[in-house]
């Protein structure tokens, strides 16, 4: 059965001691104001860019290095994980509803359910 997915979100992962400074830097660099998540203070958004690509900031735990990772959003997490494994990705952790994976070069990314609503509908690729 076909499913859809798209590269949707670039996340800036920052440990607590770097979070506020990094968040303010990227707000200034992009010209987008920080939009705090009203429910979870580990998350904030710097809005969306070309084709609805989102830039988010995530407060990670102590000991996590500052890094970037991308989220691939999909309407079928299992099918997308299976498709990406066939391309050489490796499952790292079942995060309960989404998967943390590594690409063949060892870069971390996540496969998540739909996060961007209408932007997903406009920009997702349909896979057989």
How does the language model describe each region?
Residues 1-23, 68-72, 115-128:
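N-terminal beta-strand motif that seeds the catalytic metal site of vicinal oxygen chelate
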Residues 16, 49, 65, 70-108:
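Vicinal oxygen chelate
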Residues 17-33, 80-86:
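Amphipathic alpha-helical segments
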Residues 30-66, 108-116:
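Conserved short beta-strand elements that form part of the metal-binding/catalytic scaffold
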Residues 39-40, 97-98, 119:
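Residue-level "edge-of-site" marker
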Residues 46, 103-104, 121, 125:
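Short Asp/Glu-rich motifs
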């Amino acid at each position: 059965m076909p499913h859809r997915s798209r590269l949707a979100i670039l996340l800036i992962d920052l440990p607590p001691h770097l979070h506020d400074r990094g968040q303010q830097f990227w707000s200034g660099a992009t010209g987008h104001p920080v939009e705090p998540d009203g429910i979870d203070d580990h998350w904030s958004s710097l809005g969306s860019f070309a084709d609805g690509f989102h830039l988010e900031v995530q407060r990670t735990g102590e000991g996590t290095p500052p890094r970037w990772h991308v989220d691939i959003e999909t309407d079928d997490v299992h099918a997308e994980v299976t498709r990406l494994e066939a391309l050489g990705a490796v499952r790292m952790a079942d995060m309960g509803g989404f998967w943390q994976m590594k690409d063949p070069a060892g870069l971390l990314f996540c496969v998540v359910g739909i996060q961007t609503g209408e932007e997903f509908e406009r920009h997702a690729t349909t896979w057989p």
